């Protein structure tokens, strides 16, 4: 229970720090966008590997090739490494997706890669069930 309490305290401080540094839509997006999947990722994957949230940015804004804002679930920036982390639910990212949304998602990931980000995606089900999360194998995290 102590580790859960420690996680809860650290997670609350992590969100508060980012909320205090944001205004407008960037703040609103963090208030609306950091929900169950993102918190589960923080608890079951990131916290287990790192035990802190240093260099991790939730709901990180990137301007896309059209000049529109795109908010990544997380971006970890440390030295030369810029890592986009997305948690993808089956519904919005597969079942409810049409061809245009599918193309847009692939174009967005290609754009992020071209901009120097490494992009990794986790299935929500794997995060929620604590299985097959490959982050511990990533040597630069």
List where the protein language model places each region:
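Basic, glycine-rich
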Residues: 1-10, 18-19, 113-141
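Short strand-loop junctions, especially beta-strand C-caps/beta-turns
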Residues: 61, 88-90, 122-127
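Amphipathic coiled-coil/heptad-repeat helices and related helical stalk/stem segments
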Residues: 38, 67-70, 104-105
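Active-site metal-binding core of divalent-cation-utilizing nuclease and nuclease-like domains
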Residues: 54-84
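Short, charged, amphipathic alpha-helix that recurs within catalytic cores of restriction-modification
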Residues: 99-111
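Short helix-loop-beta junction
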Residues: 48-53, 110-117
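Short beta-strand-loop-alpha-helix junction that forms the active-site gateway
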Residues: 75-102
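Solvent-exposed, charged helical/coil patches
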Residues: 1-51
């Amino acid at each position: 229970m102590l580790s859960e309490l420690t996680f809860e305290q650290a997670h609350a401080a992590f969100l508060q720090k980012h909320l205090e540094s944001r205004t407008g839509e960037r703040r609103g997006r963090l208030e609306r966008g950091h929900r169950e999947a993102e918190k589960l990722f923080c608890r079951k994957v990131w916290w287990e590997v790192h035990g802190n949230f240093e260099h991790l940015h939730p709901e990180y804004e990137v301007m896309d090739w059209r000049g529109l804002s795109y908010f990544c679930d997380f971006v970890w920036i440390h030295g030369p490494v810029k890592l986009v982390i997305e948690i993808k639910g089956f519904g919005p990212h597969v079942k409810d997706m049409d061809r245009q949304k599918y193309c847009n998602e692939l174009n967005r990931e290609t754009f992020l890669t071209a901009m120097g980000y490494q992009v990794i995606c986790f299935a929500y089900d794997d995060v929620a069930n604590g299985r097959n999360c490959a982050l511990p194998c990533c040597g630069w995290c």
